[in-house]
Amino acid sequence: GKKVPRAAISLEILGRIERRYRLSAGYFLSLSGTPDRAPGDFDLNDISPSERRRLAWHLPEDFNRRPSQEKAEILNWVRTVIISGSTDYRRYQAAAIRQRYAVRFSCASGPVRKSSPARTPEESGIVIAPKRLNDEMADLLRFKTSTFAAFGMQRNGVWGTETASQKVEHFGLWFGAFVAPPESEVQGLGVDPKLLTFAMMIFPQVWDWYLHWRERRRGFYTKWEIDLLSIAAAICREETGWLRQSPRMGSSLRPIEGLVSEADINAVQSDWPAACDRMYKHARRRIKEIDRVARVHRDPFEPILPVLEAPSPVGEYRKITEEILQRMPDERHNARAAAEAVRAFLMLRIGLHTGLRQKNLRELLLCRPGALPTSERKLEDLKRGELRWSSRDQGWEILIPSVAFKNANSSFFGSKPFRLILPDLGRLYELIEAWIERHRARLIGEAADPGTFFVKTAKMTSTNAAYCQNTFYEAWRTAIQRYGIYNPWTKRGAIEGLLPHGPHSVRDVLATHILKRTGSYEQASYAIQDTPDMVAQHYGRFLPQDKSEIAARILNQVWEAA
């Protein structure tokens, strides 16, 4: 037959036959290749189908035969460690996601999470921005993203596409807090959406209400509040502040019960520059006060701590790619599963070799062997890189113009492009070629080819094969869940103690690896296309014992020579 057994009962019967005829464990499955999916008949009737599919990947084949208490223990472990990640921040985030609140702007493009089909945006906590508020958001985006500031306006710095998209989301959450009903889980202020305007941001008491609301939700302050206050200060700054240069917006202000009175509005409208100065000083003062007590909620090192603590962080992380190769489905029987495994392997391997941010990875274009590579000028216009075959170096080359990077003005680039020849090691070239020739097309199917090297699996419900920020993150995270995290119940997974994480973590791995080997922040910065200061502040986990070990290694050479 063409179908491979995948039901738990089928696998159990095969195991009995193997024991009866003294065959090696897994003999029959080895003939048909690695199963392409998890068993489909686990006893999980009280769990929703979507969660059942996620859990099934991580349950042992004999799950149905285990005692009820042990089943509950397994399910709890899988949910806590693999599905959600057991960090304090992940638990907070999981709870916060269920409490949806935001104002959605139609003037900005970007990925939008789907609401439940049975719920309207309003029922799901999402409020569509009224026309006036939407127009104000569009005006701010023009001010911060256009090539030139409008005549008569001054500005300090511009936003790139990614930054603009992020700011739109942050403003949506800011206004969403005021709109959310007080009796809801969000415990907002219940303001009528028609009263919302960016001019609200000129009032110190409005910001103080929001800051106290943030503290109630999280329990403490973080750098998030400092970043928001920095925006408040920037838009009110003398000469270059967008709000400061838009006094006409004062006419949009209306009283908000318990927050903004008619007298407050009259005072602001009568002297707009003075009101902006007052808000600017208030924001700077609050930034200093919060900076003193701010705590770190999301520790970026926590999910990958077992990797960073290893003597060779890159060698430890590489185990995940070896696990993928070891469990690679047989392409003859499970073509799509094999293609997805190859994609996961290439994501991690290319990430480890380049240290690229996920935007640069997911937008990497593909030039097939024999085709004419895209010119550097066109790549600059597209702000994307390309993977192409280099005839000169006889290897796969990644070329990315400096303007495509988040830190394009960094001294690392000096206005020159990033160029790297990938090494022909560990089956990398073999699987790149297999991906281009066969696997990539299988995942695209009937969908339009986006032209990128990495593509997602196009399905009936999602015919777009191009990755966005969220789907690329989920693809990486899924690879870590399936192949990276050691599961004591199934004995699968590469690294014990690892937790789910996204592509950005690979930059921490590379920087820490080089720091442990060389002690040089300068050399560590080369691996992730950044500066030594950025490595020291954000990426490298370089502990005192690591520094002492490097010094001891050098000093011990004297005694070894003697």
Language model feature labels by segment:
Residues 6-309, 522, 546-549:
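Charge-rich, intrinsically disordered N-terminal extensions
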Residues 408-498:
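Active-site/catalytic core of tyrosine-dependent DNA strand-transfer enzymes
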Residues 166, 230-234, 342-367, 513:
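Short pre-functional
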